[in-house]
Amino acid sequence: SAHDYSAVTMVATKLFYVWEFDRGSAGFTSSATRENGSTLMEVSLEFYIPKITGVVNEDLMMLATSCGITAIIETYADDCAAPAVTYMFVLGWDEIFEETAYMEFTSGEQGTGTGLQTANGTAITLTCQQGEYPREYSGTQASIPIV
C-alpha cells in the first residue's frame, strides 16, 4: 500500500533488539487529536516481560536509558487462518517527523508478587508523538537488522 515501508535501512551500529511476548501481554494504541489544523498521533506501546533476572534487568536498563527508539511490532489478525496472518507496524518513525518521532521509555513497573502463583515480571510502556498513523512494514522479518 502507499502507507507502508518495505525495507529498513540502519546505521551499521544501530540494530533492532527482539522481544517476544506471551499472547495478550503486549499491544499498541494510536490516538489522534486535531488542533489548529494540525493532527498528532499519541502512540503507546505496552508490553509485559515475564520473569525478573539479572539479564532481563540489564536489557531493561538499556531500554530505559535509550534515546530514540523505533519499534517494529507484529500483530496477529486472529482470523483462524493456518498459518496465522500477521501484520507488522513501525512505531516511532513517520514521513512527517521522521527520526524525531522516536519512542521513549515512559514507565516500567516491576514486581515479584507475593505468592507462588503470582506473576513475576515487568510491565513496560513506550510512547511517542507522530504526525500520522503507524505505517505497516511490508518487508520480511529476515531483512530487519537485529542484534
Regions found by a protein language model. Name each.
Residues D94-V147:
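Mixed-charge, glycine-accented linear interaction segment located at domain edges/termini
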Residues S1-E46, E99-Q117:
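Solvent-exposed edge beta-strands and adjacent loop segments
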Residues E20-D94:
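Structured, beta-strand-rich domain cores
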